[in-house]
Structure formats: C-alpha cells, structure tokens
Amino acid sequence: MQTIIDAWFVQGMIKATSDAWLKGWDERNGGNLTLRLDEADIEPYAADFHAKPRYIALSQPMPILANQPFIVTGSGKFFRNVQLDPAANLGVVKVDSDGAGYHILWGLTEDAVPTSELPAHFLSHSERIKLTGGKDRVIMHCHATNLIALTYVLENHSDLFTRKLWEGSTECLVVFPDGVGILPWMVPGTDEIGQATAETMQKHSLVLWPFHGVFGSGPTLDETFGLIDTAEKSAEVLVKVLSMGGMKQTITREELIALGKRFNVQPLQSALDLYP
C-alpha cells in the first residue's frame, strides 16, 4: 500500500531539493520551495495526515489561496536532508476557507513550521495565479552562486541583467523572454520583501535578490528548476567572461530579435532597446 511518501509531489520535492543541494545552491538551511497542489492530489493520503493538524495564522489574508493545499519546505531545514527524512523537512499545508491561515496536514514533525519566506512564496503564488490563469504552481528560492556574484559587479538594473543573461547563453531569451526582475537589497523573511517580490513577479518569472539569491516561478518543479538552472548557467559564463577581460563580441540586438521570432516568444522590449 502506498503512503504519502510515495506520492508524486513528495518524490518531486525530494528530487528538486536534492538536485539543488548538489548544484551548490542551497547551503545549510538556505533556499525554500513551495508547490501548489489540488485537493485530488492529497485526498488519497488522508490516512497519513496528522490527527490534530496545527493551525498557523498568516500575517495578512490571502483569499485567492483559500482552500488551496501546498507542499512546502520547512524553516531551518537543510535541503540535503529532505531525502533522508521527508516528513521532518517537508510539510503539506492547506489554506483555510478565508485565506487567513493554514493547517499543517502532514509532515513538519517535532513542531517544525514552514519556511520563513512563506510570505514571499504565498504572495508570489497569488500574483502568478492571476497572471498565468493558475498555470504556474511552483515558487523556488535558492542561492545560485553565479547569479549572486553578478549582483556585485553589474549595475542592479532589470534591463541590464536581462540583456547580459540573454547574451551569456543563446537559450536564455527563449527560456525567459520576460527577463529578470531585480529588487534593492532588503531584509529577508519579511512581508516587505515578500510584497516587493510578488509585485515584480507580475512582470518576470525570475526575480533577483541582490547579494542573496533568486526567486523563480513556473508550472512544474522541472520547469522552475530548469528556469533557474538556465539563468545560472549564463551567469557562470558571464563570470568567466568578465574574469577574462570582458566581451569582445556578443549576440546583437538584431540577432536577439531573430531568435525571438524563430521560437515565437516576445522578448522584453526595454531590454532589447537598452543598446544596439
């Protein structure tokens, strides 16, 4: 008989967190991951739920998430340990009927709680639900090394970061034509950074937190992981290019436009117009 550990969403979270750890993106308890589920996903595993689910109020109501279940990583938990003890490091939560709080249905044992970045996740989920008609289901935050490094040497401007990442690897414009948003440095784990991230998610599926990390949104765990992985690969190329004296040639504006036409995507116009 299968248990909730065998469920696709638990196994998917195990793989995503393990892969992120192996990439070097999630040292210690760095990073967090949430996946929005359907009632049909969790209903077969009701026998595994806690007898008395704990209730935690949200700092602000989120009615668009009412009655929505999620699987989330825990606060203070190490990605490298998720595969060893999923129930201690992950949790299935369900937002209540008015969006004021949530019950912990499964996991997060020993009185653990969801990630401290849950406000940023839930606010971003709310915006991406509206923007994509519910298609986007994943929010991933990690400390991608080369993306962080670039925030120290490039002007922290969305159009510039977008253009440089597009130039760093040909596939980037195809994978994230909506570009990369970037915030000013802010204290993590607060409603303020959560709100700023969510507002930026209205325009971009990738949002950089300077000197800290990156947020990504997508329809599946694979798509969201791949989004960040693609941007991080380009950032790695750029870090190496900058260390070798900078670009001598690159993909031109006209070539980027041709690339967008070939793959039927609309590149962020302000990034295209930044320079020839």
From Swiss-Prot:
Superkingdom of the source species: Bacteria
Pathway entry: Carbohydrate degradation; L-rhamnose degradation; glycerone phosphate from L-rhamnose: step 3/3
**The protein's role, per its UniProt record:** Catalyzes the reversible cleavage of L-rhamnulose-1-phosphate to dihydroxyacetone phosphate (DHAP) and L-lactaldehyde.
The reactions it catalyses are: L-rhamnulose 1-phosphate = (S)-lactaldehyde + dihydroxyacetone phosphate
Catalytic residues, per the record, are E117
**Cofactor binding description:** Binds 1 zinc ion per subunit.
Could you tell me what this protein is called? Answer: Rhamnulose-1-phosphate aldolase
Q: Can you name one GO molecular function term for this protein?
A: metal ion binding
This chain's source organism reads Klebsiella pneumoniae (strain 342)
Annotated Zn(2+) binding sites: H141, H143, H212
